[in-house]
Amino acid sequence: MILLENVYYKYELEGIEALRGISLQIRDGEHLALIGPNGCGKTTLIRHFNALLLPISGKVTVGGHDTNEPKHQADIRSLVGMVFQNPDNQIVGMTVEEDVAFGPENLRLPTAEIKKRVVEALGRVGISELAVRNIENLSGGEKRLVAIAGVLAMQPRYIALDEPTAFLDPAASTRVLKIIDKLHSEGVGIIHITHNMAEAALTQRIVVMNEGRVYLDGTPREIFAKFGMLKQIGMQLPPITELLIKLKESGLPVRTDIVEIEDALVQIRSLAGKFKD
């Protein structure tokens, strides 16, 4: 479990108080979307999960370890893998397999174990065929998958991803999201920063941040039912939710707390049947 208790963080040089009393519990195996306006503290928050940043007050514990204790920080970073928004900021190898091997090599694991982890990680994200490819020859989506594979080679309990589909075309975005869903189904906890509300709607839980605080916390259905509160802070809704709201505003008896396309289709077909009668 990742546990934050009244966490504050300030960027001293800029004088920006980025986190203001964050209390949050993230369970093992949970798939959580973190959303909110630009500058609300999302990236700052996830960097506390693996001790890249340390709170100026309050407490963060991961697997029972306090991130402020140096003796636990290596273990914490093995428990929580981080995938940055720009994969070029974390890819260090010349080839795909060299990069994925970098983390296990730093753990000073036996060569056979390193090779095993590399093969397994590449297979889990579906890029085994890229093993000997030069990093410079990869697409943006492929680099994102290499970054995820590099994290997986460390065998983390959680992966925190900062906008994993940013700047990707629809096909590459779909591929990355399928891999994320697959990893979650295998028991990996996923913390997923996104500005795409359709992506957020597919997770188990959404935490909305605003001005360094937790603004809302609940299931996708609970969060998007509070569309007035979301719009107050400039947030959009999933397209399907927007459609249902417009139908309701036009006088049709539809529910607006639906986020799944299949559930929306059931409602629309039901309405069509009533009009037909």
What residue ranges belong to the model's regions?
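A short, flexible loop at the N-terminus of ABC-type nucleotide-binding domains that lies
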Residues: 1-3, 9-21, 33, 70-72, ...
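The feature captures the beta-strand-to-loop junction immediately N-terminal to the Walker
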Residues: 35-37
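Helix-to-loop junction immediately C-terminal to a conserved catalytic motif
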Residues: 50
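Conserved ABC ATPase "signature" region
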Residues: 112-130
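Conserved ABC ATPase signature
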Residues: 134-138, 142
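ABC ATPase C-loop
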Residues: 151-152
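Conserved ABC ATPase "signature" C-loop
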Residues: 212-213
